[in-house]
Amino acid sequence: MARVKRAVNAHKKRRVILERAEGYRGQRSRLYRKAKEQVTHSLVYAYRDRRQKKGDFRRLWIQRINAASRANGLTYNRFIQGLGLAGVEVDRRILAELAVNEPATFTALVETAKKALPADTSAPKADAAA
């Protein structure tokens, strides 16, 4: 049986790791062991953050919708409740896009939500103060 020399495979393996570590600071881009650790961590971070990004964007959309709906006299949760009662099925990404780029359209949606909402029974009555 022929003898198997592994130098080619070993060099390729190391080269791939060091290529992936290009741009890292200090030893992490030059020394194989440090580069391997950092590349492994980088892949873990990338995997985790691909999932985390979805929640981050949802939170951003909710903040934008809340700010725009408050500017139109309605809180975020009442706005979403009103849209549901009105039968408007627009997701938060589109609502945030409308809030930023189409304020007139967003205002129309807020008015639609206001009309669909029931009267607020927990609010103090105007004649009770008099």
Curated annotation (Swiss-Prot):
Superkingdom, natural source: Bacteria
Keywords: Ribonucleoprotein, Ribosomal protein, RNA-binding, rRNA-binding
Disulphide bridges, residue numbers: none
Transmembrane segments: none
GO cellular component: ribonucleoprotein complex; ribosome
Name of protein: Large ribosomal subunit protein bL20
Entry similarity comment: Belongs to the bacterial ribosomal protein bL20 family.
GO terms assigned for molecular function: rRNA binding; structural constituent of ribosome
PROSITE patterns registered for this protein in UniProt: RIBOSOMAL_L20
Gene3D superfamilies the record matches: 6.10.160.10, Ribosomal protein L20 (1.10.1900.20)
Organism listed in the record: Leifsonia xyli subsp. xyli (strain CTCB07)
InterPro entries noted in UniProt: Ribosomal_bL20, RIBOSOMAL_L20_CS, Ribosomal_protein_bL20_C
Keyword Ribosomal protein annotated: yes
HAMAP family recorded: Ribosomal_bL20 (MF_00382)
GO biological process: one example: ribosomal large subunit assembly
Function: Binds directly to 23S ribosomal RNA and is necessary for the in vitro assembly process of the 50S ribosomal subunit. It is not involved in the protein synthesizing functions of that subunit.
